[in-house]
UniProtKB/Swiss-Prot annotation:
GO cellular component: cytosolic large ribosomal subunit
Organism of derivation: Francisella tularensis subsp. holarctica (strain LVS)
Family: Belongs to the bacterial ribosomal protein bL35 family.
Gene Ontology BP annotations: translation
Name assigned to this protein: Large ribosomal subunit protein bL35
NCBIfam families: rpmI_bact
Region (Disordered): 1-23, 36-65
Polar residues composition-biased segments: 54-65
Length: 65
């Protein structure tokens, strides 16, 4: 049976956690941030957990993660 391909777009955006979940960067941080408050930018700085509903599709997209 051939190897399964990893979706490279998903591999760039998501990282697997130790317990089997996935984390991703917060959205709305790329540009046009001058109108945001410092508090808003600070809260967007970290990583977010992916919802459990979406983890099954991520497992299919990244079979070796």
């Amino acid at each position: 049976m051939p190897k399964l391909k990893t979706k490279s777009g998903a591999a760039k955006r998501f990282k697997k956690t130790g317990k089997g979940g996935f984390k991703h960067r917060c959205a709305n941080r790329a540009h046009i941030n001058t109108k945001m408050t410092t508090k808003r930018k600070r809260h967007l700085r970290g990583m977010n957990q992916v919802a459990k509903v979406d983890t099954t599709s991520l497992v299919q997209q990244m079979p070796y993660a």
